[in-house]
Amino acid sequence: MQKLNELQLAKELIRFPSITPVDAGVMRFLEKKLKRLGFKTKILEFKEKGYQPVKNLYAKLGSKSPNFMFAGHVDIVPPGNIKDWTVSPFKPSIKKGYLIGRGANDMKSSIAAFVSAVSAFLSRNKKFIGSVSLLITGDEEGDAVNGTKKVVDYLKKRKEKINFCLVGEPTNPNKLGEMI
């Protein structure tokens, strides 16, 4: 199994205009990538009364403890006035060594890093103890009603245990780990 390139994957993710709550196909794209790595996947769509439905993705490889989960989101805020951008927000580019595009910082690059790290791990560890999972929501930038909390509740009902979780959210300026 060959390691996925995190920069290439981040660019592919940025091309999806996944403005909350519309996923624009990004969940199916990630699902296909993860299935190729051997993950069992489930797209979970939740709709709370009075809110737009949101797609989330749960992917897991392995069935034993401990379960190490990566958690994050692929939804983005609207790009605003396109004329204010120096590049097209959904056509990723590299400028002065930085990846530019809507969602590059928050948080499609983190999702790409998660998936490429898992692919690198799997390329060196054919058999490992435990499980690796990803919880990817499409409801962090908006009301955050039909996302992470609902997926965690779903997992609890199925007796899925999360032993460790790495959240790649880069944007809380005040306190590390305070937000997702």
Which residue stretches match the model-derived regions?
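Gly/Ser/Thr-rich beta-alpha loop segments that engage phosphate groups in nucleotides
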Residues: 19, 74, 103-105, 140, ...
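Glycine/serine-rich anion-binding loops at beta->alpha junctions
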Residues: 97-113
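Fold-level recognition of mixed alpha/beta catalytic cores in primary-metabolism enzymes, strongest
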Residues: 109-116, 123-180
